[in-house]
From Swiss-Prot:
Species assigned in the record: Sus scrofa
PANTHER family per record: ACYLAMINO-ACID-RELEASING ENZYME (PTHR42776:SF4), SERINE PEPTIDASE S9 FAMILY MEMBER (PTHR42776)
Protein name per its UniProtKB record: Acylamino-acid-releasing enzyme
Active-site residues annotated for this sequence: S587 (charge relay system), D675 (charge relay system), H707 (charge relay system)
Organism ancestry: Eukaryota, Metazoa, Chordata, Craniata, Vertebrata
Main localization category: cytoplasm
Subcellular location: Cytoplasm
Catalytic activity, as annotated: Cleavage of an N-acetyl or N-formyl amino acid from the N-terminus of a polypeptide
Keywords for this protein: Acetylation, Cytoplasm, Hydrolase, Phosphoprotein
Activity control: Homotetramerization is required for activity. Tetramerization results in the formation of a gated channel which is involved in substrate selection and substrate access to the catalytic sites.
Annotated tissue distribution: Expressed in the liver (at protein level).
Superkingdom in the source lineage: Eukaryota
Length: 732
């Protein structure tokens, strides 16, 4: 019998990629004020923001679209789009005022380089631009932060001031030999470096400023800034402790001050992106006296504080610090008037049956409170799905809003006055936009969802979730009885399964997970004729805290065994072509892929990795997350730790490079030269080792790309190269 014919011609694969990459992704949504028509009908405007790959311009474009939702207070009566999509160029942040009558927009304009770009803060009212402030020209601070870690754009409750976060203004610096600045009448006072406010400091032009690591290289020392909209005056708030970097700020009740999260940056900064374990606390700074008050435990990590509609309580997420980067979190509640903090939802060690398995989201949506300030709505991975939940902050009860559905994954974009705006997708259905009202307490599972934007499903992709129980010899001694899952995609129109090749994808992290949502690469591969196995090995998020804690100290062993076990089980049950199995993974997924071709060289016929961890020991001194190297190798981390020989040996023992002599699988390496998380020298180290052993290996080095290789030009090129590599070495 002939083998399964793969879509292997470059032109065909490129055409398929071009078509699928046009699927847009939802990035944000907000709800306008309620409007009552002259006939008594009520409606609200839904403003949505989307991103889409543009292969002609080789960039991600952003666009917006508005919808009208007519309702009766409890349910949606009618909903539909209000006009076509419009591209939003230059918008970095935007936020509606509390009343919905104004909108603030942070916009970049000017040249292509960061030095030439200018930032403007605009205030819009109805059909006109009311105010525009050239923040770059005012020189009160550096660039404004637009990221979701530190960044914010918050209206005061009075709608007279705007709060945002920007980089602290740096003093000017110049050479010791800058002749135009030379003053022949210089005195001893000048030599003592007593400077005028804007006078340049000699010899500081190469002074090192720490940043916050991967994807945050332009962020160093954030400050809280307040713009008086009427006068145009900008104030940089004082009172923030010198030892912390502020972010995620909002106005306190009554506009008396500002609440913010402060991250410790002493003795040095660690990478903060995708790391919910960075020591931080909740603070309040009073605007009248500049006094700063600590509102939470300062020995843990906190994120995404959200003020209730009645301005009485603040809910936020809390995680242990300096342990695994992502883990099960606590939902905490701070009462503004009693000053009491309570834990609403605690860490869940292990899921029991169909019960809630814990909170694993890294951020709460900006809008997450119910109208009565009693319930909080959020999304979180639960095993291999992502569901919506409502938690009663008084009772601590957690109820699923999406249980018993079609098995796809949900994401909450916002909720306001109990009207929820959500995204839904599956591995075979791209994201769709839905709205629905939060039912009364006790009836949460009765949500009636109405679609605003539907995506066409792909009937030629079928998928399922496989539950896997490790064999007894692979059980964890301390955390026995843990299972794990894998999501299997396969062509639904395949004539003969025994001829279908399979691509195995372990996720990165390692403490993250695949969920049953739309993913471009797996969908592409499946439409090309591959089965795709996405493995959530033990240590993945969504399966309870015990599962996460089982992996540190066992990387390179437990996770590798889990992936291999999943592969063998699926091959046995589905009867795919065992002679054509390939691996594809990035970061820790690349780490596992390189382990697997070394530990099980007979199983895999091809391998593609992106920015893989190859040698934990050599990575520790160059990564922005040295704590990852220590913790995942099974050791505790502190900022002053100096590993001894036994620690270095353990790191090396758990690294893929240990098994390099056994590797014979053809390998495609794809590296980002600007990667701060897993520096590209890791992949180079492996490349040279394999080249010296005559293993077929190809290296693609993307000069300006970072860890995710997510730039449109890089992503598209890397996918095409990966596809051709698989087709070459698996046979078409």
């Amino acid at each position: 019998m002939e083998r399964q014919v793969l879509l292997s011609e470059p032109e065909e694969a490129a055409a398929l990629y071009r078509g699928l990459s046009r699927q847009p992704a939802l990035s944000a949504a907000c709800l306008g004020p309620e409007v009552t028509t002259q006939y008594g009908g009520r409606y609200r405007t839904v403003h949505t923001e989307w991103t889409q790959r543009d292969l002609e311009r080789m960039e991600n474009i952003r666009f917006c679209r508005q919808y009208l939702v007519f309702h009766d207070g409890d349910s949606v009566v009618f909903a539909g789009p209000a006009g076509n999509s419009v591209e939003t160029r230059g918008e970095l942040l935007s936020r509606e005022s509390p009343s919905g009558t104004m909108k603030a927009v942070l916009r970049k304009a000017g040249g292509t380089g960061t030095a030439e770009e200018k930032q403007f803060l605009e205030v819009w009212e109805k059909n006109r631009k009311l105010k525009s402030f050239n923040l770059s020209a005012l020189e009160k601070h550096g660039p404004v932060y637009e990221d979701d870690c530190f960044g914010c754009l918050s209206w005061s409750h009075s709608e007279t001031h705007l709060l945002y976060v920007a980089d602290k203004k740096r003093p000017k610096a110049e050479s010791f030999f800058q002749t135009k600045a030379l003053d022949v009448t210089g005195s001893d006072d000048e030599m003592a470096r007593t400077k005028k406010p804007d006078q340049a400091i000699k010899g500081d032009q190469f002074l090192f400023y720490e940043d916050w690591g991967e994807n945050m290289v332009s962020k160093s020392t954030p400050v809280l800034c307040v713009l008086d909209i009427e006068s145009g005056n900008i104030s940089v708030l004082e009172g923030v402790p010198e030892s912390v970097s502020p972010g995620q700020a909002f106005w306190a009740p009554g506009d008396t001050g500002v609440v913010f999260v402060g991250w410790w940056h002493e003795p040095f900064r660690l990478g903060i992106r995708f790391c919910t374990n960075r020591r931080s606390a909740l603070y309040y700074v009073d605007l009248t006296g500049g006094k700063c008050e600590l509102l939470s435990d300062e020995s843990v990590a906190v994120t995404s504080p959200r003020l209730s509609p009645d301005q009485c309580r603040i809910v936020y997420l809390r995680f242990p610090s300096l342990v695994p980067h992502q883990q099960c979190g606590q939902l905490c509640l701070y009462d503004w008037y009693t000053r009491v903090t309570s834990v609403v939802v605690d860490i869940v060690p292990r899921q029991l049956g169909e019960d809630f398995s814990g909170i694993y989201c890294s951020l709460l949506p900006l809008g997450c409170w119910s109208a009565d300030s009693q319930r909080v709505v959020f999304d979180s991975p639960q095993r291999s799905r992502q569901d919506l939940f409502a938690v009663d902050t008084q009772m601590g009860s957690v109820t699923s809003l999406t249980a018993g559905g079609s098995g796809g994954s949900w994401k909450l974009l916002t909720i306001d006055r109990d009207l929820m705006v959500v995204q839904f997708s599956t591995p075979s259905v791209p994201p769709s936009l839905k709205v629905g009202f939060l039912p009364p307490a006790g009836k949460e599972q009765a949500v009636s969802w109405v679609s605003l934007e539907e995506a066409e499903p792909f009937p030629d992709i079928s998928w399922s979730i496989r539950v896997l129980q490790p064999p007894p010899q692979q059980e964890h001694v301390q955390y026995a009885g843990l299972d794990f899952e894998a999501i299997l995609l396969q062509p639904s129109n395949s004539p003969e399964k025994t001829q279908v090749p399979m691509v195995v994808m372990p996720h990165g992290g390692p403490h993250s997970s695949f969920v049953t949502a739309w993913m471009l690469f797996p969908a592409m591969l499946c439409k090309m004729g591959f089965a795709v196995l996405l493995v959530n090995y033990r240590g993945s998020t969504g399966f309870g805290q015990d599962s996460i804690l089982s992996l540190p100290g066992n990387v390179g062993h437990q996770d590798v065994k889990d992936v291999q076990f999943a592969v063998e089980q699926v091959l046995q049950e589905e009867h795919f072509d065992a002679g054509r199995v390939a691996l594809m993974g990035g970061s820790h997924g690349g780490f596992l892929s390189c382990h697997l071709i070394g530990q099980y060289p007979e199983t895999y016929s091809a391998c593609v990795v992106r920015n893989p961890v190859i040698n934990i020991a050599s990575m520790m001194g160059s990564t922005d997350i040295p704590d990852w190297c220590m913790v995942e190798a099974g050791f505790s981390y502190s900022s002053d730790c100096l590993p001894d020989l036994s620690v270095w040996a353990a790191m090396l023992d758990k690294s893929p490079i240990k098994y390099a002599p056994q590797v014979k699988t053809p390998l495609l390496l794809m590296l980002g030269q600007e990667d701060r998380r897993v520096p590209f020298k890791q992949g180079m180290e492996y490349y040279r080792v394999l080249k010296a052993r005559n293993v077929p290996v190809r290296l693609l080095l993307y000069p300006k790309s970072t860890h995710a290789l997510s730039e449109v030009e890089v992503e598209s090129d890397s996918f095409m190269n990966a596809v051709l590599w698989l087709c070459t070495h698996l046979g078409s």
